[in-house]
Amino acid sequence: MLLTLHAATGAMLGEFASTPAAAFGLGFLSHFVLDMFPHGDRMIAHDTKATGNGKRYYWLVGIDAFAALAIFFPAFALGRFDHPWLAYLGLLGGLLPDLIVAIPEYALYIKKEYRVRLRWFYAFHVYVHDQLIRVFDGMPLKIGIAFQVILLALMWRLWR
C-alpha cells in the first residue's frame, strides 16, 4: 500500500479524533484495514527478496515518500488541518506499522536480538496483508497504484 495513502488516512482520521491517543490509535488501526485490500505491490516485495535486486521497489518507496512529503508539508505549513497535532499523530500512526515491519526486514545493521523481538508484529502484518490479497494475487502494480490514487483522490475530495 502506498505510504501516501496510509499517511492521508491516518491524518484524516486523526483530524476527527478527540484525543492524541485516539488520533494515533485510529491511524495505526487504519493501516491494517487498508492493507487488507489488494494493492499490486506484493510481487515486487517477493521479487526483491528472491533476487536481492530491490531497485524497483526502492524507487517506488522513494517516489511514494516524496509524494507524501509534497502533499503533507504544504498541508501542515498552510494550516490545512483544523487540528494539526491530532492529524500529525494520526499520520504517524498510519505509517508506523510499515516502519516496524521494515526494521526486521531491511535494517540488518540493528542487532539481531532486537529484530527478533519484532517478528511477532511482522507475522501479524503479513497475515493481515494476505487475507484479501490472496484472492487478487496476480494484480498488476499499475492497477494497484491506480486503485490507490483513485482512493486517495476520493478521500481528498470528501475531506475538502
Which residue stretches match the model-derived regions?
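N-terminal membrane-targeting hydrophobic helices
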Residues: 1-160
